[in-house]
């Protein structure tokens, strides 16, 4: 199973929750997998699929998890989702969708895309305002020059768009529903997994919903305007207008 979606959308919680179900194991964000993704973008799906399967099979063997159904939760898998699902024909993708305004708020707080940020993530991919591999060709300089809020909204838009690429093999979980009505959020996931709905509901019910809607409190009018300008169409399409 691949849990995908934008960073700060609840992918970590969802991956851990589903990985705790009987017969499953949470693989967390597999670092070699995450590090390989930028170089696989644009490769034919069959080529990328072979590389991804090789990485994950090695990790599963080393982690003694070969007898369980793995739950991989790297958000960047969104950009190679078709290849990942080709590598594992029986796998399901779970796309965790959260209000992009709340995601932007959280990304601004973390500072991963901020002009002043230094350092790197767990896959040694650097933080800061530079253009990531998912920025549209020809817009790299623009990305580095816009406001932090615009970059945060840009990231959310690109991730949710990419994660929607294989709808026939993807279950969608809205973070807001997950925290307010775990049973409703769990039902389609349980059905696709062939799992007991009550078990999925129970693990989803452990989510904390205090961060839902925090953009109303934490974003400045200028930041909100930047987010709406960059991602307004995507927000509206997903019901967050």
Label every PLM stretch briefly.
Residues 1, 67-70, 92, 223:
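Short active-site oxyanion
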Residues 62-83:
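Glycine-rich phosphate-binding loop used to anchor ATP phosphates in small-molecule kinases
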Residues 3-5, 70-73, 95-97, 172-174, ...:
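Short beta-strand segments
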Residues 1-64, 112-117, 123-124:
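PAPS-dependent sulfotransferase catalytic core
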Residues 12-15, 78-81, 101-106, 180-182:
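Short catalytic/ligand-binding loop motif for oxyanion handling, primarily in non-cytosolic enzymes
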Residues 1, 116-119, 123-168, 172, ...:
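PAPS-dependent sulfotransferases, especially Golgi type II membrane carbohydrate sulfotransferases
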Residues 87-107:
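Conserved phosphate-donor/acceptor-positioning beta-strand/loop module used by diverse small-molecule
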């Amino acid at each position: 199973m691949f849990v995908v979606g934008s960073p700060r959308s609840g992918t970590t919680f969802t991956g851990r929750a589903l990985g705790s179900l009987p017969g499953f194991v949470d693989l967390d964000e597999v670092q070699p997998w995450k590090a390989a993704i930028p170089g696989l973008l644009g490769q034919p799906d069959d080529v990328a699929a072979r590389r991804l399967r090789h990485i994950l099979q090695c990790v599963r063997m080393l982690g003694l998890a070969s007898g369980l159904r793995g739950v991989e939760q790297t958000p960047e898998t969104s950009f190679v989702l078709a290849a990942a699902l080709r590598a594992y024909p029986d796998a399901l993708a779970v796309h965790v969708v959260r209000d992009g305004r709340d995601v932007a708020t959280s990304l601004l707080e973390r500072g991963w895309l901020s002009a002043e940020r230094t350092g790197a993530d767990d896959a040694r991919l650097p933080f800061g305002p530079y253009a990531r591999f998912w920025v549209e060709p020809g817009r790299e300089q623009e990305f580095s020059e816009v406001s932090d809020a615009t970059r945060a909204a840009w990231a959310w838009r690109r991730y949710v768009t990419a994660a929607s690429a294989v709808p026939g093999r993807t279950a969608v979980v809205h973070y807001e529903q997950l925290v307010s009505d775990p049973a409703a959020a769990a039902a389609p996931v349980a059905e696709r997994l062939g799992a007991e709905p009550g078990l999925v509901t129970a693990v989803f019910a452990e989510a904390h919903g205090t961060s839902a809607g925090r953009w109303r409190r934490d974003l400045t009018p200028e930041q909100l305007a930047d987010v709406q300008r960059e991602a307004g169409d995507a927000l509206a399409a997903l019901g967050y207008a």
